[in-house]
Amino acid sequence: MPTQFKIAIDGPAASGKSSAASCLAQKLNFQRLDCGSIYRAITFIVLSEFTTLPSLDSSNVKGFIENIKICVKNQRIYFNNRDITDELRGEMIDRTVGKIAKVKYIRQKVHKIERDIIDNCKGGIVVDGRDIGTVVMPDADLKFFITASAETRAKRRCLQNESHNYDEILNEINKRDYDDIHREIDPLRQAEDAIIIKNDDITFDETIDLLIKKYNEKIHQLNK
């Protein structure tokens, strides 16, 4: 087995990739990097500074964003020595993060943060996002693309929060899928060598079992 083993997990919104990545990393005793949380952190910081989303092309906003210093430690995100991890989930951030994530200079900044973390990782790491196997970590030892139909993903979101309206959530997911797939820079797509996991008809535990099975097969192959 190589001294550093890298696993990339990509997939659309609400596919369960983040939960799967977290569980897989825990079971393998690997480090885990949630790339979506970095975009959320930048979104949170920008909204905290400007209240509403400003023009991302203006020089003062660009300068502010480029000077943001984020630290990721033990799956927690710190800004100005403050843990902001638990503040990154909310409707405003949900509605805004897609606009932040499609801006070229922001993506370049996030990619640098991600690659620095990956390069400094000792041992194994599980990295999840939307462009991991294609852009951030194309040299990953193992790549997964976790997906499900938009309808399945909307139903799961509603089960997690009964106050959600199914039709509204479905529309949001379809819009996010369209935006991710048609994004000019680093669109969502599966890597050619990724293992596709469609989890419409399997449980979360079965998904994890399948990921571990594929990992063990890869380790066996490397040890031959």
UniProtKB/Swiss-Prot annotation:
Q: Which reaction does it catalyse?
A: CMP + ATP = CDP + ADP; dCMP + ATP = dCDP + ADP
The UniProt GO MF terms for this protein read:
ATP binding; CMP kinase activity; dCMP kinase activity
Origin, by domain of life? Eukaryota
* Top EC class of this enzyme: transferase
List positions binding ATP: G11, P12, A13, A14, S15, G16, K17, S18, S19
Would you tell me the Gene Ontology cellular component terms?
cytosol
* UniProtKB keywords: ATP-binding, Kinase, Nucleotide-binding, Transferase
- Record GO biological process: nucleobase-containing small molecule interconversion
Q: Record keywords: Transferase included? A: yes
Q: Fetch the Gene3D superfamilies from UniProt.
A: P-loop containing nucleotide triphosphate hydrolases
Q: What is its EC number?
A: 2.7.4.25
> What family classification does the UniProt entry report for this protein?
Belongs to the cytidylate kinase family. Type 1 subfamily.
What is the name of this protein? Probable cytidylate kinase
Show the taxonomic lineage. Eukaryota, Fungi, Fungi incertae sedis, Microsporidia, Enterocytozoonidae
